[in-house]
Amino acid sequence: MPPKAREPLPPGDAAKGEKIFKGRAAQCHTGAKGGANGVGPNLFGIVNRHSGTVEGFAYSKANADSGVVWTPEVLDVYLENPKKFMPGTKMSFAGIKKPQERADLIAYLENLK
């Protein structure tokens, strides 16, 4: 049986997403143009970027070799459970279970360009 189709995310609120970013991602990631990598890579321009391509960041083999393009739809699945989506990733984040919070964070990430 094919997997059940995923429900599309509700519309996201970038202002709420910024708060989520600051509370859950900023300890490991930056989102500023030209910003330094931290424990995780700089997320400026993440939406529609190929995984494993931020210069100067040492990615896990799983991430570097994944071939993933970070579309909003892919980010939705990844952010729900990073380790399930990409076994072997270095990202230790447990994930965001609430669809609205993922939608808000993705709306914020879409503005980082």
Curated annotation (Swiss-Prot):
PROSITE patterns: CYTC (PS51007)
Pfam families per record: Cytochrom_C (PF00034)
Chain positions with N,N-dimethylproline modification: P2
Segments crossing the lipid bilayer: none
Annotated Gene3D superfamilies: Cytochrome c-like domain
UniProt-annotated location(s): Mitochondrion intermembrane space
Modified residues (N6,N6,N6-trimethyllysine): K4, K83
Heme is among the record's keywords: yes
Family in the record: Belongs to the cytochrome c family.
Protein name from the UniProt record: Cytochrome c
Organism: Strigomonas oncopelti
